[in-house]
Amino acid sequence: MSERKPSRLALIGLVAVAVIGSAAFYLSRPGETNASEALDKAKASQKLQSLTELNGKAPDHRKLDVQTWSTAEGAKVLFVEAHELPMFDMRLIFAAGSSQDGDAPGVAVLTNAMLNEGVAGKDVGAIAQGFEGLGADFGNGAYKDMAIASLRSLSDKDKRESALKLFAEVVGKPTFPADSFARIKNQMLAGFEYQKQNPGKLASLELMNRLYGDHPYAHASDGTAKTVPAITVAQLRAFHEKAYAAGNVVIALVGDLSRAEAEAIAAQVSSALPKGPALPKIAQPVEPKASVGHIEFPSKQTNLMLAQLGIDRDDPDYAALSMGNQILGGGGFGTRLMSEVREKRGLTYGVYSGFTPMQARGPFMINLQTRAEMSEGTLKLVQDVLADYLETGPTEKELDDAKRELAGSFPLSTASNADIVGQLGAIGFYNLPLSHLEDFMQQSQALTIEQVKAAMNKHLGTDKMVIVSAGPTVPQKPLPAPTDKPSEQPLGVPEH
């Protein structure tokens, strides 16, 4: 939860979905071309458009003709034809993230990780070789709200049909072999041991626990060292049966396919999944009380995290908050936080803020690392910057610059098939209008200073913050005075 999302992609608020689950494997054989190679060759053959050529204008944005329907089993499908490359991308987004773990934290991540570990007649190695031999890429991942399985394949009928057959088996009928289950559990347990040496992770876990209490978002997606060993294969099978049901998935498809071919693919995949309805949406969290916590950790630096409940994905203030946060701390250099904390005082390498809208109210967070002996003063400085921003709002120049950056980076949201399939998946998963991207852009460009200020004050309050620090308890020093050229640069390389 403490990782920062790149500001240019946060402009849509969906690009996290466009890239998660992207871990894939492939091995090309002599004389064969795989889907990723086809994409790389196409990119290499295109002339890059330089910033000089753009002459200050935003690059062209690719408008999407989104087609949508539902399969006989209840799966929602979103499809965009794209015939430029002989390939297609498919992403299945299940409401099967860790918020559905119930009393077994970690079961969602384990279930997803086990999908490609075995099917009837094939172990994990044979599955990998099967995709590789077809020039196809498989990817999967599980998070708070969702679990994902993805396929990239050449659109040639022979390769496509074989890849789809294997993909449908992997997603719909995994066997959950015991040896793989033990291996992945051990990997997760090793990860928990590593977390003990990561103050940023420890602070993040404590922060989410304080922020969400008994809500399903409180626990880490991968569970804990206590919960994971107790999870059984029977629990994985039961979770797969209900959470990977056809009624609980959105199928996003982009590529060199006709509507008829896309319908056939969606029907094939949907029919391979367990039969069942969508799972109920999780409840909204209860507003926590403001609090301050500290984790003692031997280090030269202190991790600082501030958070409060933000918004869900349906909030009408989404565009205004995205713009407001971009100016506060969502970008790199030039944001309010970065200017005051790093550029003028040299207290950190980076300080970032962000909303994470989810099915229920996700967190708004500010996080940074700073010298331990200046941690208290730095925390107060961050709080003062936020308070001042809420009181004054953005300047006209800040708002104009943020709008210009958004307009310039907006085309990246649909620059490739992988980008598009991620956008479609998010639109379908969060039940957004098909025109969401254009709507968001229009709303953002029309924002006024007053609207941004009002939205930020409506959803944020300096008296609501949950604060967690992780680092040593040491005598504190006063902060340096602000200057255009800080005499002391940030200490060393950021830890962890």
Report the location of each language-model feature:
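M16 family metallopeptidases and their MPP-like homologs
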Residues: 80, 85-113, 124-171, 185, ...
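His/Glu-rich zincin catalytic helix
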Residues: 5-19, 23-137, 150-155, 161, ...
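Short conserved segment of the HATPase_c
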Residues: 196
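Short, polar/flexible loop-turn hinges at active-site or ligand-entry regions and domain interfaces
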Residues: 118-121, 171-179
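Histidine-acidic residue clusters that define the catalytic metal-binding segment
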Residues: 47-69, 209-249, 277-285, 410, ...
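N-terminal glycine-/lysine-enriched basic segments
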Residues: 192
